[in-house]
From Swiss-Prot:
Annotated Mg(2+) binding sites: T86
Protein name, per record: Holliday junction branch migration complex subunit RuvB
Source organism phylogeny: Bacteria, Bacillati, Cyanobacteriota, Cyanophyceae, Synechococcales
Database matches in InterPro entries: AAA+_ATPase (IPR003593), AAA_lid_4 (IPR041445), DNA_helicase_Holl-junc_RuvB (IPR004605), P-loop_NTPase (IPR027417), RuvB-like_N (IPR008824), RuvB_C (IPR008823), WH-like_DNA-bd_sf (IPR036388), WH_DNA-bd_sf (IPR036390)
SMART domains named among the record's database cross-references: AAA (SM00382)
Gene that specifies this protein: ruvB
């Protein structure tokens, strides 16, 4: 069931979708087992950098829950991967002085899986379900009464032998996380008392995260270098820390130093085919392919076929950042480069 306890303690060729992209916000195996990354996690909401409005709302809700001695209302966190949804779930549990159990929706395959999770909870505990939009219908429906009335309504047997059984549950808080809010059914979405979007981080917030982590791993990283790295991290702490670790590799192995300068960052990222905009080879091939269409809109499926990639991956992994930085626009007829995007890709013809 993939339940985890909450003890916080190249060349320029198109990348295939199963290859690691340093600028992909999805977590990779190395990051799951990296002890330094675990040590870098904040222990309280106050230590959590960024998301000030979200933290303020959570602080009020948590304090009100403690004051009334009631369970915190169920919380839905939505936003792009790598912004801290799992970390926030741990912090909420910590602030409530309780435990947090984690499950991922794809691992909850059968109704009995969610039943086992719910029956294993104690009074006041937090259950965090990542990718909650991927719950199957039967499992989701079991959550309705559990979230609303803290009970399970189970149907057992078949045909004439069918009988219903109600099991009371301890009062708990469900925290759901999703990157696809629109994919969550209305009945499930409406049962969350608190729904909050996790925003991208600004440069100063990412810079502080990088400086804190550099001290933890004994790197000399100055303000200017940390700010330069923050600017190409796509507003995402996970990407920022991953890039810093790769820059550290280059610094220690190639340059034999623990001091990170702006020039060293440029050389290191250039070796990984990442430019000063934070774009990699897949981004550039995507932009170049559209640019060849001479300002005529082109459909996503045609782009995917031309690049040999999955259209869903391009839509949800590649395009959002290109739109965010003003290089790409979506129209009813297809994708188009903006003037900025065309200027950028034309200038990259000889760079990589």
């Amino acid at each position: 069931m993939a339940i985890i306890s909450s003890n916080i303690g190249d060349n320029d060729l198109p990348l295939r979708k199963k290859e690691l992209r340093l600028v992909d916000s999805k977590i990779i195996p190395e990051e799951k087992r990296n002890n330094n990354l675990n040590l870098a996690r904040p222990l309280t909401l106050k230590e959590f950098i960024g998301q000030e409005q979200l933290k303020s709302s959570l602080r009020i809700a948590i304090d009100a829950s403690i004051f009334r001695k009631e369970p915190l209302e169920h919380i839905l966190l939505y936003g792009q991967p790598g912004l801290g949804k799992t970390t926030l779930a741990f912090l909420i549990a910590h602030e409530l002085n309780t435990k947090c159990k984690i499950a991922t929706a794809p691992a909850i395959e059968r109704p009995r899986d969610i039943v086992g999770l719910l029956l294993g909870l104690k009074e006041g505990e937090v259950l965090f379900i990542d990718e909650i939009h991927r719950l199957n219908r039967l499992t989701e429906e079991l959550l309705y009464s559990a979230m609303e009335d803290f009970r399970l309504d189970l149907t057992m047997g078949a045909n004439k032998g069918t009988r219903c059984r109600t099991i009371n549950l301890p009062r708990f808080t469900l925290i759901g996380a999703t990157t696809k809010l629109a994919s969550i059914s209305a009945p499930l979405r409406d049962r969350f008392g608190i729904s909050q979007k996790i925003e991208f981080y600004n440069y100063d917030e990412l810079k502080q995260i990088l400086l804190n982590f550099s001290r933890l791993i004994n790197l000399n990283l100055d303000d200017e270098a940390s700010y330069d790295l923050a600017k190409i991290s796509r507003g995402t702490p996970r990407i920022a820390l991953r890039l810093l670790r790769r820059v550290r590799d280059y610094a220690q192995v190639v340059m034999k130093t623990n001091t990170i300068s702006v020039n060293l960052i440029k050389k290191a990222l250039n070796s990984y085919q990442i430019d000063d905009k934070g774009l990699d080879s897949l981004d550039r091939h995507y932009l170049s392919f559209i640019n060849q269409n001479n300002n005529i809109p082109i459909g996503l499926d045609s782009i995917a076929a031309g690049l040999g990639d999955d259209s869903s991956m391009l839509e949800f992994v590649v395009e959002p950042y290109l739109i965010k930085i003003g290089f790409l626009t979506r129209t009813p007829r297809g994708r188009l480069l903006t003037a900025l995007g065309k200027k950028y890709i034309d200038s990259k013809n000889d760079d990589f």
